[in-house]
Amino acid sequence: MKFGKVIEGQSVAEWASAYFDYKKGKKIIAGIAKNPSEGLYGTSGILGETPEEAIVKRGQIHRFHPLFQEFLDQQANKVEEFFENLVSDARERMDLISDQVDIYEKLRAFKKGTLESGSVVLIQKQHSKLRQRLDSILNFSRLQPAYHIPARKSVPTDAYTPMVSYRKLKSKLKTTLLDFYDYLKLVSQYQHLNQQAFRKIVKKYDKTLHTDLQGFWVDYMSRYTFTDFSITTNWQLHVEDIYARLFTNHNKKLALEHLKSFRQKEHFSANSMRFGLLFGAGLPLAIEAACYYNATEQSSYLLQIWGGFFLVIFAFVLFDLDCYVWEKTRVNYMLIFEFNQRKSLNWRQHLEIVGAVFFIFSLFFFLCMRNFFPGFTIYFPALFLGVVGTFLIAPVIVPYWRMRRYLIIQLIRVFLSGLSTVHFQDFFFADQMVSLTYACGNISLFFCLYKRLWRQPQLCNSSHSPLLGFFTTLPGILRVFQCFRRYSDSLKSFPHLVNALKYIFNILAQMFLSLWRIHPGLKYRVLYTIFAGVNSLFSYTWDILMDWNLLVRKDGRWQFREHRILKQLWPYIIAMILNFIVRSSFIFYCIFPNHIQHSSGISFFVTLAEIMRRCMWNILRVEHEEIYNRENLRAARELKPLDFVKPHSDVFVSHQISSDKNYTDDEDSMDDQTDVDEAQFS
């Protein structure tokens, strides 16, 4: 493989502009070989030599061609400057980690001594709850943040939490050490690739121009610090020592296994095969079940409920497709979503879980529509939901507990929008729910049907149930809360309040659609058409200019942004056109007004198109974040020192021990085994 491809494949995409420009170096060498006299400033004429002889002579006196020398200086200075920034950032991280290690060791020593002396309870039992609350407030006032690293302005960080338990502090410190070790490996890889690029380009220069300057290159590069690997090596050794001392009982070998275990080295062919088997077995069942549909009232409502389940599964499949596209285009979605790259599932593993759920769905759907058990048909959707719910919350008996736990926590965070700081994955997940209005409306339909024991099911549909209309607006309401919270944290009316206005139009459109279904007439039809049209135009403009940032205004003209993941422009143009078409799908409700009362078929296909549009939207939305990271040379997760605390006095230690008095030091030695056990199911 050519070295240009090697450096392109092994480099950190977010640091691409800071690497040695190997392709440009090759072009300069080719230009010198084609026109050797260029840039020699008349040297050949003064010495009475041909240009070729002048180059050879310069090689003999250990000098590069002036154009090539200028290029090397420019590239070396660029790499050196960026490496110094990396070292400075690493030093700040190391100082912060050292402070937290000191806190942790003091806390552990104090806890161990307290447990041995038997004086665990530091707050006397006779103190009232009010006194304990006052003590906690006093402790809060004595705590200060250990360090401050400014975060991205549009994504404010959480306020620090001073009451961090010993167990939580240990977990955070372990994760921080692992992240920092990975960061040092990226820095070391940056050094290695650039040093190798310099060596390769000089070798090519010697080969093309028949010189021998490898020795001079060694002396030339020795003055740059990025050629000195001792800096990163010493830090890596220091992290290894800290990790071994704190978490593996001085077992250096085990510490190295933990630090150097990368999930990316695993193979996922078995996961892909299992997904193929599950999907291949489920798809024929689902198709045959749909063929058994008969136009009875009960079957129509059953099909509507199963349709909602299918759309949710389909949305997860398309998200995995997004992950595949990001992986192929080298978009670091793990960093953007702030996933733990060591513990998070690969998208193929996630797809295997979705395949299992799809197979269960297809099996129950087939049994329901085929009417295998007369009298039990209406209970198959509830049974499916119970099986999947058990599958979701079972921590041990079902594999991949970490992913399922993350999904549960993310759902809770979305439904509690506004109560905590909103991160990228929070509003991204809520945006997926905005595209699932059909499934959200089915929540009301599902519980209404079973509450009424499937008697008079027409009273539960969209023409009779205001609650169904409310559930279709719920995702938009949650997004509005998130926008208000982001405004509260940043105090920036733009873009957060304007974004909230966009979702308010979405809520109003869904509300008037529900009112039109309940009260057929011209008034609500006109109101729905107006607000749905405004929402579509507003959302489409926001997609292009803000979420995707495809069009930028430069020199008084609108043009496509300069930096794009894909070199061709036509995929972005097609995405803009398709996005507009699907955004205008509200028009179908106006075209078929006679079916508006119970238009489950129209709603299903409109939502299906919206989910596919969301899949496309996801790709370009995350690409926008990736471009931001590349422009700002951000390739690693930021340390969040505000999650840690810095004690002002021993009161801090006392409070931590009192909150963790049931956590004995013997459990320290069990943590690594616990990590191994969890890894088997993650």
UniProtKB/Swiss-Prot annotation:
Region (Disordered) location: 659-682
Subcellular localization is given as:
Cell membrane
Keywords of this protein's UniProt record, alphabetized?
Cell membrane, Membrane, Transmembrane, Transmembrane helix
Which topology term describes how it sits in the membrane?
Multi-pass membrane protein
User: Can you give the residue ranges of the EXS domain?
Assistant: 459-654
The processes (GO biological process) annotated in the record are:
cellular response to phosphate starvation; phosphate ion export across plasma membrane; phosphate ion transport
Q: Where is the composition biased (Acidic residues)?
A: 665-682
Q: Topological domain, Cytoplasmic: which ranges?
A: 1-274, 322-348, 399-406, 448-525, 593-682
Q: What does this protein do?
A: May function in G-protein coupled signal transduction.
Annotated GO molecular function terms are:
inositol hexakisphosphate binding; phosphate transmembrane transporter activity
Extracellular side stretches: 296-300, 370-377, 425-426, 547-571
Q: Which organism's genome codes for this protein?
A: Schizosaccharomyces pombe (strain 972 / ATCC 24843)
Q: Which InterPro entries match?
A: EXS_C, SPX_dom
Q: Which family does it belong to?
A: Belongs to the SYG1 (TC 2.A.94) family.
Q: What is its main location?
A: membrane
Q: Is Transmembrane helix there in the keyword field?
A: yes
Q: Name one GO cellular component term.
A: plasma membrane
Membrane-crossing residues?
275-295, 301-321, 349-369, 378-398, 407-424, 427-447, 526-546, 572-592
User: Any idea what this protein is called?
Assistant: Protein SYG1 homolog
Can you give the residue ranges of the SPX domain? 1-219
